[in-house]
């Protein structure tokens, strides 16, 4: 994907984007390429791969969600943010978003600090912790929790749900394996009082994307999330 192609698609998805938005993405791309070897961020560091696999694939799931509007000021936590995907990408488009980036890897947290500073982003918090540890102090705090390629659906829902307020959303982009993963997650979905209210189904980058949108209907029981090693050993 060329720079021109990316900008054309971006404008189609989000008509309010301006030249400053385009320049922020260009700067983001340059920062990834500059620091990739230092922080071991990704194997996809060519221009076309960053435009397509990083930026566009991260944004596409959010283009048709009613509660993501130009001036949204929702509180969102990106769990396992890594190189800022999808949280920082969303922040560039939705400038009033109140963003928290959660990343367990210290080196990648250092990169996220550099990235957000160089992009001049406001209302961004970065936590170098595991999700199950941070939930002890930030339960029921966010409107939205999301992640990308962190874990299977049952696991990511368990470590995410406690962060979200009642009537908030968990947004989980997945591949065509979504249905298989959701079947395995049916017990945790019920236990955590979640309900899938939407399934966004679309093609992007020649891949079939499925995005599950879950509504949190009640407060998450205090015993969740369990320690990560227990989540791995004894899935519900």
UniProtKB/Swiss-Prot annotation:
Q: Which GO terms describe its molecular function?
A: rRNA (guanine-N7-)-methyltransferase activity
Give the binding site residues for S-adenosyl-L-methionine.
80, 131-132, 148
Q: Classify the source by domain of life.
A: Bacteria
As recorded in UniProt, its EC number(s) are 2.1.1.-
What Pfam family does this protein match (any one)? GidB
Keyword annotations from UniProtKB, A to Z: Cytoplasm, Methyltransferase, rRNA processing, S-adenosyl-L-methionine, Transferase
Gene3D superfamilies per UniProt: Vaccinia Virus protein VP39 (3.40.50.150)
Principal localisation: cytoplasm
Q: Does the keyword ATP-binding apply?
A: no
This entry carries the following GO cellular component terms, namely: cytosol
Location(s) in or outside the cell? Cytoplasm
- InterPro entries referenced in this protein's UniProt entry, alphabetically: rRNA_ssu_MeTfrase_G (IPR003682), SAM-dependent_MTases_sf (IPR029063)
User: What does it do?
Assistant: Specifically methylates the N7 position of a guanine in 16S rRNA.
Give the protein family.
Answer: Belongs to the methyltransferase superfamily. RNA methyltransferase RsmG family.
Report what the protein is called: Ribosomal RNA small subunit methyltransferase G
User: By which gene is this protein encoded?
Assistant: rsmG
């Amino acid at each position: 994907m060329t720079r021109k192609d990316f900008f054309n698609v971006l404008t189609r998805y989000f008509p309010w984007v301006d030249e400053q938005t385009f320049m922020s993405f260009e700067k983001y791309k340059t920062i990834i390429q500059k620091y990739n070897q230092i922080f071991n961020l990704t194997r996809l560091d060519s221009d076309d791969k960053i435009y397509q696999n990083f930026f566009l694939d991260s944004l596409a799931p959010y283009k048709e969600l009613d509660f993501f509007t130009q001036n949204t000021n929702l509180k969102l936590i990106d769990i396992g943010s890594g190189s800022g995907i999808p949280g920082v990408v969303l922040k560039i488009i939705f400038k009033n978003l109140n963003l928290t980036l959660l990343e367990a890897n210290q080196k990648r947290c250092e990169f996220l600090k550099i990235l957000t500073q160089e992009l001049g982003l406001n209302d961004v918090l970065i936590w170098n912790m595991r999700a199950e540890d941070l939930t002890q102090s930030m339960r029921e705090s966010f409107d939205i929790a999301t992640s990308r390629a962190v874990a299977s659906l049952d696991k990511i829902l368990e470590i995410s749900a406690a962060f979200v307020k009642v009537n908030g959303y968990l947004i989980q982009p997945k591949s065509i394996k979504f249905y298989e993963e959701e079947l395995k997650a049916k017990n945790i979905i019920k236990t955590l009082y979640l309900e899938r209210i939407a399934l966004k189904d679309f093609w992007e980058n020649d891949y079939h994307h499925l995005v599950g949108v879950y509504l949190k209907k009640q407060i998450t029981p205090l015993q969740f999330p369990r320690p990560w090693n227990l989540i791995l050993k004894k899935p519900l």
